[in-house]
Design a protein with these regions (language model features):
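Short functional micro-motifs and their immediate structural scaffolds
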Residues: 15-16, 33
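Active-site-adjacent beta-strand/loop module that shapes the phosphate/pyrophosphate-binding cleft
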Residues: 102-131
Length: 168
């Protein structure tokens, strides 16, 4: 990973990527850790069906995805689920009904930068299908699909493919 070259402290072109986790300046004592970003993915279910969203932006535009996104500073994973489902699908959910399932590491490639993420997977079961209003800047289509009809080749991210391999 060599996206950064210049040290923000001394301005020399001396940053080196080390140990697959940090940039260190060879001229001064500056160190920048590239820690994992937390992200959530919510498996919205109704009976044996799963709600999938089709991505309307890169990375993986046109691939199927679970609703979710990055955790903002000072935000819990559960609140991230609430916020993302409201933003993307206009769904109001109760955090008491969220069920944590598992997590997987992932790499999110965006505008030439690789972001290491830790994707936290939750399940939210709904009693009745309701009208879903998708955020069209992020989502081009939504689809309810039976669990046994899911095709991993159509899933956007490796972490979600690994999740579905274990979950299904």
């Amino acid at each position: 990973m060599n996206e950064l070259d210049f040290c923000p402290k001394c301005s020399s072109k001396s940053l080196k990527w080390q140990e697959n986790k940090k940039w260190s300046c060879t001229k001064c004592d500056f160190v920048l850790y590239h820690n994992c970003a937390a992200a959530v993915a919510v498996l919205v279910t109704h009976g044996d069906e799963i709600l999938l969203t089709k991505r309307n932006q890169e990375p993986a535009k046109g691939k199927w995805d679970l609703a979710g996104g990055f955790t903002d500073p000072n935000e819990s994973a559960e609140y991230t689920c609430v916020r993302e489902l409201k933003e993307e699908l206009n769904l109001d959910i109760d955090t008491k009904k969220l069920r944590y399932l598992m997590s997987f590491p992932n790499v999110y490639y965006y505008k030439g930068i690789s972001y290491n993420t830790l994707d936290l997977f939750f399940e939210y079961q709904i009693e009745e299908k309701c009208e879903v209003v998708m955020e069209q800047s992020e989502i081009s289509e939504i689809r309810w699909i039976k669990r046994n009809e899911l095709s991993l080749e159509d899933i956007a991210f490796e972490s979600q493919k690994r999740f579905f391999e274990k979950y299904l």
